Amino acid sequence: MKVRASVKKMCDKCRVIRRRGRVMVICSANPKHKQRQG
């Protein structure tokens, strides 16, 4: 899980979602692409 000021999709399998007011990126293809904003 990377914590970043700005989260972006790293591949076409990445999905941007909101959980508990936080913007997150989850990826089924590559778990290294997981990110959280803040």
Swiss-Prot record:
A Pfam cross-reference name: Ribosomal_L36
Recorded superkingdom: Bacteria
Gene Ontology MF, one: structural constituent of ribosome
Alphabetized InterPro entries for the sequence: Ribosomal_bL36 (IPR000473), Ribosomal_bL36_sp (IPR035977)
GO biological process: translation
Alphabetical UniProt keywords: Ribonucleoprotein, Ribosomal protein
Gene Ontology annotations for the cellular component aspect, listed alphabetically: cytoplasm; ribonucleoprotein complex; ribosome
PANTHER family xrefs: 50S RIBOSOMAL PROTEIN L36, CHLOROPLASTIC, LARGE RIBOSOMAL SUBUNIT PROTEIN BL36C
Annotated family: Belongs to the bacterial ribosomal protein bL36 family.
UniProt-recorded name of the protein: Large ribosomal subunit protein bL36
